[in-house]
Amino acid sequence: MTVTTSSPTTAEGRTPGIGRVARVIGPVVDVEFAPDELPEIYTALHVDRTIDGETAVLTLEVAQHIGDNTIRAISMQQTDGLVRGAPVRDTGAPISVPVGNATKGHVFNVLGNPLDVDKVDAETYWPIHRSAPAFDQLESKTEMFTTGIKVIDLLAPYVRGGKIGLMGGAGVGKTVIIQEMIRRVAKEFGGVSVFAGVGERTREGNDLFLEMTEAGVIEDTALVFGQMDEPPGTRLRVALGALTMAEYFRDVQKQDVLLFIDNIFRFTQAGSEVSTLLGRMPSAVGYQPTLADEMGALQERITSTRGHSITSLQAIYVPADDLTDPAPATTFTHLDANTVLDRAISDLGIYPAVSPLDSNSRILDARYIGQEHYDTAREVQRILQRYKDLQDIIAILGIDELSEEDKILVNRARRIQRFLSQPFFVAEQFTGIPGKFVPLDETIDSFRRLTQGDYDHLPEQAFFMCGGIEDAEKNAENL
C-alpha cells in the first residue's frame, strides 16, 4: 500500500525539481522544467501566489506533457495572483488525503485539508490515484446488502459492494435516505460512511453537515466537498479523494463502507470542462472523449474485496430527463440497482417516496434472492401496475364501475402502497414516530400475506408509516 512520506521522491528515486510558470490561462498552468526533471502525470505541484500582500500555496496536478520540457497542469484553486516566472515545486507524489479514524466526523476539501477544524491528527496519507483491486482479490459471490428498508429490500435490493443510482428531483427525500443509510450502516452493521459532495451547492453541503450532526450520525462519517464554486479540477478529483478514504477503511481496517457521491453527473461535467481546457476534441454532445475511461477508473475501484466491501450510493442528475444523454448513460452501465424517487408518491405523504415500478436491481432474480422473495416482489409489482392502469378509469367513472375482482385488487394495492412507507430513525424528531429496521424475512412474509389477501380486513390507514405487519395490526386496533 502506498503511503506518502514527509520527504517525497519521484518514482525513479530522484529528488523532485523546481520549474517556472510559463503561461496561465484560467485554471490551466503551463510549467517549464529542466529536461531531466519533468514530473509524471498526476504529480502534485506547489506554487506560491500573492494577493493583497497575502501569500498562499496553490496545488496543481500534472495533466499533460506538451513538449519543449513543458507540462500542462490543472489548478485545484483559483489562479488569481499567479505570475509568469514563479517557481513551481515538484512534490514527487500525487495529491494525497488523510485516511483512518482521524477523518471521521470531519469535513475535508480535495487536498485533504479539514474545513471544520484547523487540523486533524492523521498519521497516514494515501494518494488519490490508485489502481482498482486485482482480479484475484475480488469477492466472487453476489450477496444482498440488507438495508432494513422494506421497499428497497423487497423490490430493488442492493448488492454488497455494488453501485446504486439514486435518482430524484428536489425535495423528494434524497438527503433523508442518505442520512438514514449512514445511520443504519453505523448502528446496525458497525460500518462507516464516506460522503463526496461533487459540484453541488455549498448551502446544501453545510445543511447536510448540520443535519447529520443533529441526527447523531456525523461521528461515523467522513465528508469530502468540492462544491460548484470550485475550479473544475477540484470537482473532478473530489470523488477520488473520498473513495481513497473509503478504500482505507475497507482494506486496512477491514470494515464495510458506504460511499455516497452527490452528484455523479457533476463529476462528468467537471471532466468535460477539464478536457476542453486541455484542448481535446469533444465527443458526442460535447462531452470529453475520455468519458468512459474516467468513469471506469472511478467505478472499478468501488467493489468488494475478500470479506469487505465498498457499497456506493450515487445521486444522478439526468439532463433534460434524457436517459440517453452520454453522461447518465455511461453511469448506468456500471450500476447494479436504481432507486427512483417519485414526486407523485411524495405528494401522497408516503416516505420513502421510492417508485416500486420504476426502481430496479440486477439481483431481483430467484438465483440471488430465492424463489419466495422473487415471487413476492413480482406479485407486488403486478398488483401495483394493475392499480396504475386502472387509475384513469377510476378518475373518470369512479371505483364503482370496476369489476368485483378489480375492486379487491385496487383496495389491496392501496394497502400495499401504504405499507411500503416506513418511519426513519433520522426523521424521528420531525415525525414523532420511532424509526424501524425491518428484517428481510419479515418483509417478504408480510408482503406475501398482503398479496394473498390475509389483511384485506384491516383499514388502509393502519398500514401507513409502520414497520412490520404487527405494527399495522396494532394501528388497526387504535383506529
UniProtKB/Swiss-Prot annotation:
GO MF, one example? ATP hydrolysis activity
Entry GO CC? plasma membrane; proton-transporting ATP synthase complex
Database matches in SUPFAM superfamilies: C-terminal domain of alpha and beta subunits of F1 ATP synthase (SSF47917), N-terminal domain of alpha and beta subunits of F1 ATP synthase (SSF50615), P-loop containing nucleoside triphosphate hydrolases (SSF52540)
Which CDD domains is this protein grouped with? Answer: ATP-synt_F1_beta_C, ATP-synt_F1_beta_N, F1-ATPase_beta_CD
The catalytic activity, as recorded, is: ATP + H2O + 4 H(+)(in) = ADP + phosphate + 5 H(+)(out)
Please name the InterPro entries in this protein's record.
AAA+_ATPase (IPR003593), ATP-synt_VA_C (IPR055190), ATP_synth_F1_bsu (IPR005722), ATPase_alpha/beta_chains (IPR050053), ATPase_F1/V1/A1_a/bsu_N (IPR004100), ATPase_F1/V1/A1_a/bsu_N_sf (IPR036121), ATPase_F1/V1/A1_a/bsu_nucl-bd (IPR000194), ATPase_F1/V1_b/a_C (IPR024034)
Alphabetized UniProt keyword annotations: ATP synthesis, ATP-binding, Cell membrane, CF(1), Hydrogen ion transport, Ion transport, Membrane, Nucleotide-binding, Translocase, Transport
Q: Which residues bind ATP?
A: G168, G169, A170, G171, V172, G173, K174, T175
Its membrane topology is listed as: Peripheral membrane protein
User: Pfam families attached here?
Assistant: ATP-synt_ab, ATP-synt_ab_N, ATP-synt_VA_C
Q: What is its EC number?
A: 7.1.2.2
**Annotated coiled-coil segments of the chain:** none
Gene3D superfamilies, per this entry? Answer: 2.40.10.170, Bovine Mitochondrial F1-atpase, Atp Synthase Beta Chain, Chain D, domain 3 (1.10.1140.10), P-loop containing nucleotide triphosphate hydrolases (3.40.50.300)
Top-rank lineage group of the source organism: Bacteria
Q: What is its main location?
A: membrane
Subcellular location, in the record's words?
A: Cell membrane
Q: What does this protein do?
A: Produces ATP from ADP in the presence of a proton gradient across the membrane. The catalytic sites are hosted primarily by the beta subunits.
NCBIfam families associated with the record: atpD
Family per record: Belongs to the ATPase alpha/beta chains family.
What interactions and quaternary structure are annotated?
F-type ATPases have 2 components, CF(1) - the catalytic core - and CF(0) - the membrane proton channel. CF(1) has five subunits: alpha(3), beta(3), gamma(1), delta(1), epsilon(1). CF(0) has three main subunits: a(1), b(2) and c(9-12). The alpha and beta chains form an alternating ring which encloses part of the gamma chain. CF(1) is attached to CF(0) by a central stalk formed by the gamma and epsilon chains, while a peripheral stalk is formed by the delta and b chains.
State the name under which the record lists this protein. Answer: ATP synthase subunit beta
